[in-house]
Amino acid sequence: MSKSGTKITFYEDKHFQGRHYDCDCDCADFHMYLSRCNSIRVEGGTWAVYERPNFAGYMYILPRGEYPEYQHWMGLNDRLSSCRAVHLSSGGQYKIQIFEKGDFNGQMYETTEDCPSIMEQFHMREVHSSKVLDGVWIFYELPNYRGRQYLLDKKEYRKPIDWGAASPAVQSFRRIVE
């Protein structure tokens, strides 16, 4: 485990079997060590794991825990190639603003809590811009924390491309807490 207490282990086979690769820092390309990834054990920290090298492709956020099959982290397949530790803010404060239009225009909603459905909670169909005032958050493209994930640190996001999305399809979001 690193000095910061972060550690993740990737396994080629389900249920933590087969070849494995241990990592305690950001890694832009580990697919040369493993041909596939079917299970993961996060022993310290929260991690963002990516389908392609250089932190590209589908991203999955994994807090401490065991993931015996790729479906347990909502993976689409057994391909992962890069990872990075998620650095959580100190103090445990969380606050986010979401906007119905780009560049912080239109109706704005502010919350400090997780939201399983922006349609039910805020009567919004999409999120076109956002300001993360405190904490680290995950946007999900579907309700109930499903679908593609996007990691948002403390900063301003004027349009969906700023958080890595091709469209404003955000239907739920939540805080990353340790």
Swiss-Prot record:
InterPro entries listed in its UniProt record: Beta/Gamma-Crystallin, Beta/gamma_crystallin, G_crystallin-like
One of the Pfam families matching this protein, by short name: Crystall
GO molecular function: structural constituent of eye lens
Signal peptide: none
Chain segments carrying region N-terminal arm: 2-5
Job description of the protein: Crystallins are the dominant structural components of the vertebrate eye lens.
Protein name: Gamma-crystallin S
Organism: Canis lupus familiaris
Gene for this chain: CRYGS
